Amino acid sequence: MTMIETQLRSLLVTTKPIRDLTIDAVIAATKRAEQRIAPLWPLRYFVAVNPYLGLIDHTFADAAQLLARRTDARMTAPRDFYAQAIKSGRITDADLAAAIADEKLPSPAPASVAALKEFAFSKDPDPATTPLPTIADVATTVTGINWADFVTDAISTWAGAYFDLGQSYWRSPWAQLPAYAAWRAEAAHDRTAQARGVHGMRRALRELPETALETIVTAVKMLNIPEQGLEAYLHRLLLTIHGWASYARYLRWDAELYGGEDHTLTDLLAIRLVWEVALWHSFADRGVAEAWHKCKPELSNEQLTETARYALAGNILLQRAFEKSYQRQLFARLGTARPATTPQRKRVQAAFCIDVRSEIFRRALETTTDDIETIGFAGFFGFPIEYVPLAEVHGGAQCPVLLTPQFVIAEAVDGASTDEVAKIIERRALRQRVAKAWRMFKFAPISCFGFVGPVGLAYLRKLVLDTLGITRPVPHPAQFGLDARTREHVAPILEPGLIGDRPTGMTLEQRVAAAAGALKAMSLTDNFARIVLLAGHGSTTVNNPHATGLDCGACGGHTGEANVRVAVRILNDPAVRTKLKEQGIVIPDDTVFVAALHDTTTDDITIFDKHMIPASHADDLKRLEADLAAAGRLARAERAALLKIDRKADIDRQVRQRSKDWSQVRPEWGLAGCAAFIAAPRDRTAGIKLDGRSFLHSYTWQQDSDFSVLELIMTAPMIVASWINLQYYGSTVDNRLFGSGNKTLHNVVGTLGVLEGNAGDLRVGLPWQSVHDGENYVHEPMRLHVLIEAPIPAMTAIIAKHEQVRQLLDNGWLYLFALDDRGVVTHKYAGNLQWEPV
């Protein structure tokens, strides 16, 4: 039993049942409502999240109806998007017929191709859907004043100060208290609500308890919410502060990941309920009580009108047909890969992240020469670490957010003595303190006026250089406080040690286990090349609050630099190789692992720790660098069209300039377009132009005797890929709810998120400019197509074992197909652990 259940059950002693509503019902409804909210990671590591994560126990169609009723959300593109696809021939009659046959939607729904096409081309708009009512909605209707937006703004203003992570110079005096206690303490002094006409706020604060859980129970009792509508009502309230609720859900996710608890989301729900009670006390006698009594039964009936259900079904069928059209094109390309070559030792094996942006670069690299083999693997390369920068005591988790770091790796300075490192740390700390003090002087509410006059003009040179992209407006956090010489020599230290009382580094046994696991997961256990390149990835942008969203999601929203440098040092260690040999993994003496970083904005490759590469491989390295440079030019040329770059001008210069342009709202397209995840040997896709839309994971099932690697793929990278895909999907089909709006209007709040403008809810998801070029969608909304070359019984067993995987597949949140040894699709997963031939 969790703490929330224990505390709520304790109320049985002091609280009578709410008519037919029991405390158990409140516990269950509160938990379900909170579980419906997907987490939102802060900007410092903005990883992609499936915005429908709390709804995967529903079918896609049922979730669409639920969200339409609870917050007027869309889960499909506008109808004319599909109509245009039909008109252009992209969606065929066969696609429409297949969608109707597969979806099996209940009536009312278009039941024939003719009916579905008639619906697609109809000029009638979709019927309006009225969300479930709240007291704020009713008060808005009755009084003509938008109390719903007022409440959202009020909570958002408070939350921005309370959750601030260091942006504000005047911290909330109650920041150390739990959220609900802090809000009550501030509300006791704040008269904004009364000044705006919510005179019932003081009464609500007096009548409602001082703990969040008791407040939820008491408020539900006062408003007399029916049990069958309680979850819907509480979920609806959380959706009115969706962004802040999502951030609170992240705090809970993070706490639970490390074995703890967090009740901030419950506190936010209680705060929102206090506003409901306050509005009730303020306007009940002005018609709100009567209006609430009339509309409250809607909470127990979430059924849409018949015309709305027909429109929703039609849109879902059109979406399915659109996905069918992509499947048809993708399947036609697969099976046309270059014939597999006779196994022989390659000059270079280059492992990249499975990220869709790597597909373009990998294909370009393979085009430059036939003696390079590329490999796809999650960008943390099997090394889940917390990387602690120099002079810090804590670092970021360099692994997927589904995992916790297993090792703490500290940063050191290569070649420096202990005393020298101590002096470097002291200098960095001093520079950081001075910079912080200077920044406080610049931006503090009082001193900023004295700063602008005498000092402001001195910034003219920097302003010009920043504008021209010659300098960065803000130093990169990883380099801040370090001089140029030191930056060139910082590196991970693997030897066991301590930071405070925390052990750091890895023992030999731990290094061997991690190395073996990584190599097996990459299907790289023999036939090693002379150079094995491990290329993590990151991005280079300026003036971009969501910059970490362009970095590596598998590295927790960081670049993959730390992971590849750690991996390479371990894999080049003779002691590790000796132990690996005992496990049957023999790495030749002339094989050298090399760490690199792929800049996805510029398609440049940076190679790290060149001084550690033996002289015997100098020519190999020089040739590899030439190959990487040539591949970068090819990749930039391919991406130029989508970036609307003038192909007659210098493409390379223009692409690199975008990464330095602080006015550029689209420095790169990120993972826009992502639509497929393929786990198979590279031979199955080699030479096939997949347009940078496919996650490519190398996997050879014949080397996976117990299918543990397959299980890892289907429960980690496949899930992460679906999160990315559905984040882009949600941000495209309903940017109002699941995206972050217009990037040019963003204001960073508390360094943790953005507002669109100066008020409103915290925004989630991606900016509109990340999915749309101003004229057309760049990201085509479609659910992820997973294609795996593995025995069907093995995949079925994994689906049956893991509930989340089964929910995603059985409820239609992603598609799964089986490949044969030619790369041809043979079967599709049909739900309920059944497969059908394709």
Curated annotation (Swiss-Prot):
Its cofactor is Zn(2+). GO terms for molecular function: zinc ion binding. It is found in: Cell membrane. Keywords: Cell membrane, Membrane, Metal-binding, Transport, Zinc. InterPro entries: DabA. Signal peptide: none annotated. Coiled coil: none annotated. Its main location: membrane. Zn(2+) binds at residues 353, 355, 537, 552. Forms a complex with DabB. Belongs to the inorganic carbon transporter (TC 9.A.2) DabA family. This is Probable inorganic carbon transporter subunit DabA. It comes from Chloroflexus aurantiacus (strain ATCC 29366 / DSM 635 / J-10-fl). The lineage of its organism: Bacteria, Bacillati, Chloroflexota, Chloroflexia, Chloroflexales.
